[in-house]
C-alpha cells in the first residue's frame, strides 16, 4: 500500500471510464474504508453521478479541491474544463477536453507529490484531436506533459509482461526506430520496472524483428547488426538479457516463465499476445466478456499505469462495462509506488 492517494483520471467521460471507476470503487470498498487504499478521481462529477445511477449505487464520492490539506480516502476533483453536458457514447470535443484536463491535473498533482501515481481510464483519440490536442495517445501526451523525450510502453497480464521498442508508427518505419540507443533504453527501463515489482534479478528476452531472427541475414540484418550487439553489451554490464529470440516462439517461452519480460519490436508484435490472453469475447454477441491487462509507461518522472482497452462508446452508460483492467492498473500502480519508495529508503 501507499499512504498517498492514487490519481485516477476518468478519460473521456462519454466512454466507459466513469462506469469502470465506480465499479472498481465498489469492488475495492473494503480497502478504501480502512485507508489501505486511497483514490482521488479526476474528471466530470456529472459523469460520475450518471455512472452511479446506471449501476444503481449511491456510493459516496465527495468533491474536493486540489488545495485541500487532507482528502477523504475516496473523493473526486472536478476537471478544469468547460463544455456542454456530455452524453454517454457520443464522441465530442468536450469529451476530449475533459480527458486532457484531467490528465494534466493528475500529472501536476503527482509531480508535486500529492498523489503517488496516476492511473488512467481510456480516452478517445478522435475526441482528443477535436479538442485541439494532437497526440497519438496517452503515452505521448504524458511524455509531453512531463518534458520527457523518450518513454516506453509496457503491457502486462499475469506473467506476460511486454515492453515495446516502437508503438504508434507505421510498420514500414519500425526498422528505423530500432537503434542501439533505443533498444538499450527499453531494456534498462524494463529491468528497472521489474525490480520495482519485486523481481530481484530480472531476466529479459528481446524479440527478433525479422522472421527467424534474420536467418543469418537472408531476411534482414537488423537482428544481427543492431539487436545482438546491444544485447551483448547489456549482458557485459551485468543484466540478464537473451536474444534476439524469434517472434513466433518468444511469447510461448515467456508464458511458460522462462523469463520475466519480453521486449517487442513493434505495436502488434507485443500487443497481440497480451490481449490474446487477457481479452475474451462472447461468440454469440461479439461483445467483450473480459478485459484484463495493464498499460504501464516507463521512463516518466512519475508512475503511470492504465487500462489496456478503449472507451467502448457502444456500451457506455449501459452498466455492463468490465472493470477488471482498471483494478489491475490500480494494483500495479500501488506496487510500483511501493517499489519506488523502497528504492529511495
From Swiss-Prot:
Keywords: Carbohydrate metabolism, Metal-binding, NAD, Oxidoreductase
Quaternary structure, from the entry: Homodimer.
Organism field: Bradyrhizobium diazoefficiens (strain JCM 10833 / BCRC 13528 / IAM 13628 / NBRC 14792 / USDA 110)
Binding site for substrate: 138-139, 275, 295, 304
Catalytic activity: 4-O-phospho-D-threonate + NAD(+) = dihydroxyacetone phosphate + CO2 + NADH
Manner of cofactor binding, per the entry note: Binds 1 divalent metal cation per subunit.
Protein name as it appears in the record: Putative D-threonate 4-phosphate dehydrogenase
PANTHER family with a match to the protein in the record: 4-HYDROXYTHREONINE-4-PHOSPHATE DEHYDROGENASE, D-THREONATE 4-PHOSPHATE DEHYDROGENASE
Protein task: Catalyzes the NAD-dependent oxidation and subsequent decarboxylation of D-threonate 4-phosphate to produce dihydroxyacetone phosphate (DHAP).
GO molecular function: metal ion binding; NAD binding; oxidoreductase activity
Source domain of life: Bacteria
Entry's family note: Belongs to the PdxA family. PdxA2 subfamily.
Cofactor: a divalent metal cation
Positions annotated to bind a divalent metal cation: 168, 212, 267
EC number in record: 1.1.1.408
UniProt KW Oxidoreductase keyword: yes
Amino acid at each position: 500500500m501507499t499512504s498517498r492517494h492514487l490519481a485516477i483520471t476518468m478519460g473521456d467521460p462519454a466512454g466507459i471510464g466513469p462506469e469502470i471507476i465506480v465499479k472498481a470503487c465498489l469492488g475495492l470498498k473494503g480497502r478504501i474504508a480502512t485507508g489501505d487504499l486511497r483514490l482521488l478521481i479526476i474528471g466530470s462529477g456529472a459523469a460520475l453521478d450518471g455512472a452511479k445511477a446506471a449501476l444503481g449505487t449511491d456510493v459516496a464520492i465527495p468533491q474536493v479541491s486540489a488545495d485541500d490539506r487532507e482528502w477523504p480516502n475516496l473523493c473526486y476533483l472536478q476537471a478544469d474544463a468547460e463544455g456542454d453536458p456530455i452524453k454517454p457514447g457520443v464522441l465530442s470535443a468536450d469529451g476530449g477536453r475533459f480527458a486532457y484536463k484531467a490528465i494534466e491535473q493528475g500529472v501536476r498533482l503527482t509531480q508535486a507529490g500529492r498523489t503517488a501515481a496516476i492511473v488512467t481510464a481510456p480516452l478517445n483519440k478522435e475526441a482528443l484531436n477535436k479538442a485541439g490536442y494532437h497526440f497519438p495517445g496517452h503515452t505521448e501526451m504524458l511524455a509531453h506533459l512531463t518534458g520527457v523525450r523518450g518513454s516506453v510502453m509496457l503491457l502486462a497480464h499475469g506473467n506476460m509482461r511486454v515492453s515495446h521498442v516502437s508503438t504508434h508508427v507505421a510498420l514500414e518505419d519500425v526498422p528505423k526506430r530500432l537503434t542501439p540507443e533505443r533498444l538499450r533504453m527499453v531494456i534498462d527501463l524494463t529491468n528497472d520496472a521489474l525490480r520495482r515489482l519485486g523481481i530481484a534479478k530480472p531476466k529479459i528476452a528481446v524479440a527478433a524483428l525479422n522472421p527467424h531472427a534474420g536467418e543469418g541475414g537472408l531476411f534482414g540484418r537488423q537482428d544481427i547488426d543492431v539487436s545482438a550487439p546491444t544485447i551483448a553489451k547489456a549482458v557485459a554490464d551485468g543484466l540478464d538479457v537473451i536474444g534476439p529470440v524469434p517472434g513466433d516462439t518468444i511469447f510461448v517461452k515467456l508464458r511458460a516463465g522462462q523469463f520475466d519480460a519480453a521486449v517487442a519490436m513493434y505495436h502488434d508484435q507485443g500487443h497481440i499476445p497480451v490481449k490474446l490472453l487477457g481479452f475474451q469475447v462472447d461468440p454469440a454477441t461479439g461483445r467483450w466478456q473480459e478485459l484484463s491487462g495493464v498499460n504501464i509507461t516507463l521512463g516518466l518522472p512519475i508512475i503511470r499505469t492504465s487500462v489496456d482497452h478503449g472507451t467502448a462508446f457502444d456500451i457506455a452508460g449501459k452498466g455492463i462495462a468490465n472493470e477488471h483492467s482498471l483494478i489491475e492498473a490500480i494494483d500495479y500502480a500501488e506496487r510500483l509506488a511501493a517499489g519506488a519508495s523502497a528504492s529511495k529508503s
